[in-house]
Amino acid sequence: MTSSIREWLNLSVRWFHVFAAIMWVGQTYYFTWLDGQFNRLEKKAAGDETPPQVWMVHSGGFYAVAKQKSLGVLPEQVRWFRWEALMTWLSGMVLLFLVYYSSSGLIDTDVANISQAAGIAIGLTVLLGAWLIYDSAARSPLGKSEAAFATFSLIMIAAISFGLMHLLSGRAAYMEIGAMLGTIMTANVWFRILPSQRKMIATAAAGAQFDASLGAQAKLRSKHNTFMAVPVVFIMISNHFPVATYGNTYACEILVALVLIGWGAAKIIREA
């Protein structure tokens, strides 16, 4: 592959990746905001069985959205939100291979004298291993406590960041953490949120009362995704600021601190 073709491929995939991410994160925060509005309206109208509506104005019209407790249309008429997450992850993985796994950007011999193959193996192991650890923790009693789970997650991110900063180049280590969080977010959508939603739709279509825990499980993973999205976006743009981020003497500490700041920002947005 010539350098010119590689550069255009890099640019095209990056463009696609950013736009897909905008669509995914945008809809995630939109529904997060909607849920917050519905919760406030339900508290005000305690005892009223009429589904509350959120009124909005956008472009050239007014919109009224109501949250339903039953399925009022055929299952095939329900709009799913899934491809945005998959397209974001797939394009991100292509970028990871283009920029790091198939180039010299992955390894820094001043950091660790390892082979390219070893670096790739480390990177892929982190992506899979982090999901398995996160998912196990989220399904355990630890996942029922927001403070305990947040503490565990921060320790996990800090430990993996520290390890990667001593094995890969600083830039690759940062992007690997971003890819790790993005992989967890996508796996949440496809392996936890969508299966719960399928069961909810199938049960509702059959005229039965669906298990409320299904919705709670999907909502919890969606909540986790809103907290991971902000640090991921930061990591995406960190490439442009090497002195302040991955090239800094305190690169690992800066990354962990900015994950915390990102979580704080996400909490503010969620409560707006």
Predicted regions and their residues:
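Polytopic transmembrane helical bundles with strong interfacial aromatic enrichment
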Residues: 1-272
